[in-house]
């Protein structure tokens, strides 16, 4: 898919910081009050808006339908705009520029479901997770030979070349070894469309991918594919800010936690991700907690 040109979406707040009282703002359409650090307020006032970066070729989190950006992250962004009294501008750009752009200070926030890794945590701070990004597998619905993770022993598996599904192979090998199983042949693909086609054509027995993408695929084609177990240790996805921007990080965590407590986060997960995560951490993870690099 061609990455769309950059454009801006403006928040609907009519007056910048109009409802601020001693650094505490009252959301016009929400009963929650958000305490905003004065340093952060001055930064936003100086520029006049908060600038977030997203992509739009990452379904179900961010994608385009008839030229309109939609998805899980966009739904959360709409909620964020409703409870913040300052303007929020969104710039859409290719994935490769999002995290470096935030790290360099070009953007305030990477509002995209980025996988939390130790390497990224060296130059970014992550919010509390918004979804799980663990690796699972799918198989053909009619393949009765695979009923559990142990049944992957000796099976031919499809993964994306250079992707996190390939990086999860050591985790799977360790799990199989614990169950006295062994890893079978691994086939690498440039993209998952080819891997899924080979699964249908019985050239591979299962395909490994992040659990959200697989859940969406199985929801779309329940008569063809079946979701299996996680093959990696748990991993998470979150938004990211520049390293050391604790004021913005605290504000975003407050917002996300409020969405979790009022049930909105779960509702949006069910709608867009076709799976809900009941036990996501409520605090940002520390370096070393992420298993997939």
Map each language-model feature to its residues.
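Extracytoplasmic small-molecule ligand-binding "clamshell" domains
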Residues: 32-113, 252
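Ligand-binding cleft/hinge of the Venus flytrap
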Residues: 77-84, 165-188, 218-220
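Acidic, polar ligand-binding/catalytic clefts
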Residues: 4, 78, 82, 87-151, ...
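Short helix-initiation/N-cap motifs at beta->coil->alpha
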Residues: 90-100, 186-197
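N-terminal secretory signal peptides and thylakoid transit peptides that target proteins
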Residues: 1-19, 23-25
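Extended ligand-binding regions for polar small-molecule ligands
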Residues: 25-29, 34-35, 74-83, 143-146, ...
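Periplasmic-binding protein-like
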Residues: 56, 131-139, 211, 215-257, ...
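A ligand-binding cleft/hinge motif common to bilobed small-molecule-binding domains
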Residues: 97-100, 114-122, 168-175, 197-233
């Amino acid at each position: 898919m061609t990455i769309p040109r950059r454009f801006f979406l403006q928040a609907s707040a009519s007056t910048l910081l109009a409802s601020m009282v001693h650094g505490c703002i009252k959301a016009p359409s929400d009963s929650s009050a958000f305490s905003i650090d004065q340093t952060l307020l001055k930064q936003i006032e100086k520029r006049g808006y908060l600038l977030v970066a997203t992509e739009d070729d990452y379904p179900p989190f961010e994608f385009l339908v008839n030229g309109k950006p939609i998805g899980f992250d966009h739904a959360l962004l709409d909620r964020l705009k409703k409870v913040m009294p300052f303007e929020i501008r969104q710039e859409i750009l290719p994935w490769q520029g999002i995290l470096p752009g935030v790290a360099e200070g070009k953007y305030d926030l990477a509002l995209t479901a980025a996988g939390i890794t130790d390497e990224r945590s060296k130059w970014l701070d992550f919010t509390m997770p918004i979804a799980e990004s663990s690796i699972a597998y799918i198989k053909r619905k009619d393949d009765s030979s695979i009923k559990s993770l142990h049944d992957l022993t000796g099976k031919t598996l499809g993964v994306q070349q250079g992707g996190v599904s390939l990086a999860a192979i050591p985790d799977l090998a360790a799990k199989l070894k614990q169950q006295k199983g062994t890893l079978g042949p691994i086939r690498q693909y440039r993209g998952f469309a080819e891997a899924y086609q080979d699964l249908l054509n019985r050239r591979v027995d299962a395909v490994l991918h992040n659990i959200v993408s697989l859940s969406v695929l199985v929801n779309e084609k329940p008569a063809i594919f079946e979701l299996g177990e996680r093959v990696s240790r748990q991993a998470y996805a979150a938004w990211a800010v520049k390293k050391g921007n604790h004021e913005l990080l605290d504000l975003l965590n407050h917002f996300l936690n409020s969405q979790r407590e009022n049930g909105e986060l779960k509702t949006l997960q069910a709608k867009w991700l076709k799976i809900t995560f009941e036990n996501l951490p409520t605090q940002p993870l520390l370096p070393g907690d992420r298993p997939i690099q």
